[in-house]
Structures are given as structure tokens and as C-alpha cells.
């Protein structure tokens, strides 16, 4: 379980107590959030909505390991993926995983529509930088990331609707993506993030030929 969540070798290091002392690491995060979640939940009710989310995240699991990602958290109808910088930038995994997930869901559109009357669509943000990685808790131990990078990634995702973009990527990450020619991108200068004093430059990213939803 720990290997799936944080990467290979983490569980053994946890047993050895290595993470009891906080470590500074560099990570890339993706925050994935279900579009129109309130409307879907109100129509389906709690039980069927939970099944809907389960089915959607089964499709996510189909693509995560193929793109060297770990699922850090599920929070309601949101999932948080994490990579080391090396694994996230290799083959542009931190970008490609989103579009593969969308393709996976598209292939199951009829299934979702027939079973639930809705098909899941997601929006996402990608950002990265230095965070603290540490073991927390005593009765229930957990490994957790802390730092402004995580908060910033969440704030970026909250702008997807405003900019009418499925995927927003920070300048920090977009500048080091190798295969930019595979994508269409739109730059947003001086993007204001709630609770932040400084603005950021963001990029709305689509596969070439895709229309902004």
C-alpha cells in the first residue's frame, strides 16, 4: 500500500524510522477534480454517487502506474497524484497521464451514461517544487507531504473553470516539459491565486486538435 502511494522502497524506510525526521524533497503534484460534482451528486444520491466515483477512479488506476505516478490521496471526488521530478518529467508523464485518463473515461462513456445517466469529466492542475515529507501520528501513522507547493497546486486547479481549461500547468513545470510540440497551450499571465500575494504564469494545455471545453 505504501509503495503504491509513495513509490517503491518507501514502506521499508518507514519501518526503519527514516521519515520520523522530516525530509525536504522535490515533487510534482496533480490535483484532479470531478466537474459538475454537485449536480451529479444531487441527481444520483449519496450511494449511487459513491459508486460513480469508485468507477471513475478505477479508470484512473488503469493509467496511473503506466505513467510512474503514485496516488497520494483521494478526497471526496478529488484525487491527488505525485511524482518525483525525474519520473514526472520522463516522457512528460505528469502531462500525459491526464489525457490518457480522459481517453480511458471516453472509452467508457456509454457505460457511465447507461448506468448513471452521467459520464465523468475531470479538470486538473500540475505544479511542483520543494515540499517536506514526514511520518506523522502515533496511534495511526501516516506519511504526508507539507508545503506551499501543495496549496498552490490546489489553488491553480480552482482556476480551471475561470479560464475554461481542463488542464492548467504552472510555468515551473511547463518550462521543463520536453515535448511541448505535442500540445496546444494558452498562456495566462499574472494569474491571481486566492490567498496568495504573488501572481503566477499558468498554461492551459490541450492535446493538439482538442477544443477547450
Please provide the spans of the model-predicted regions.
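Regulatory cytosolic signal-relay segments
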Residues: 1-25
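DHp/HisKA dimerization helices and adjoining segments of the cytosolic kinase module
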Residues: 49, 94-105
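Catalytic core of nucleotidyl cyclases, primarily class III adenylyl/guanylyl cyclases
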Residues: 67-93, 109-148
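Conserved, well-folded catalytic cores of nucleic-acid-processing
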Residues: 104, 108, 156-163, 180
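Catalytic/regulatory signature loops of cyclic-dinucleotide turnover enzymes
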Residues: 127, 148-172
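Intrinsically disordered, glycine/charged-rich C-terminal tails and inter-domain linkers
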Residues: 162-213
Amino acid at each position: 500500500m505504501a509503495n503504491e502511494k509513495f513509490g517503491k522502497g518507501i514502506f521499508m524506510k518507514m519501518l526503519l524510522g527514516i521519515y520520523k525526521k522530516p525530509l525536504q524533497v522535490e515533487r510534482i503534484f496533480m490535483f484532479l477534480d470531478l466537474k459538475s460534482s454537485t449536480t451529479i451528486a444531487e441527481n444520483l444520491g449519496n450511494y449511487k454517487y459513491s459508486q460513480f466515483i469508485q468507477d471513475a477512479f478505477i479508470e484512473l488506476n488503469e493509467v496511473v502506474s503506466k505513467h510512474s505516478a503514485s496516488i497520494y490521496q483521494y478526497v471526496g471526488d478529488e484525487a491527488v497524484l505525485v511524482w518525483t521530478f525525474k519520473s514526472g518529467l520522463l516522457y512528460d508523464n505528469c502531462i500525459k497521464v491526464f489525457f490518457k485518463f480522459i481517453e480511458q473515461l471516453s472509452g467508457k462513456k456509454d457505460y457511465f451514461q447507461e448506468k448513471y445517466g452521467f459520464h465523468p469529466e475531470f479538470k486538473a492542475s500540475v505544479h511542483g517544487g520543494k515540499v517536506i515529507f514526514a511520518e506523522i501520528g502515533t496511534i495511526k501513522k501516516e506519511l504526508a507531504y507539507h508545503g506551499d507547493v501543495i496549496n498552490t497546486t490546489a489553488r491553480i486547479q480552482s482556476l480551471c473553470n475561470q479560464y475554461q481549461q481542463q488542464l492548467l500547468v504552472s510555468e515551473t513545470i511547463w518550462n521543463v516539459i520536453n515535448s511541448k510540440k505535442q500540445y496546444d497551450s494558452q498562456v495566462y499571465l499574472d494569474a491571481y491565486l486566492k490567498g496568495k500575494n504573488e501572481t503566477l504564469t499558468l498554461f492551459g494545455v490541450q492535446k493538439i486538435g482538442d477544443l477547450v471545453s
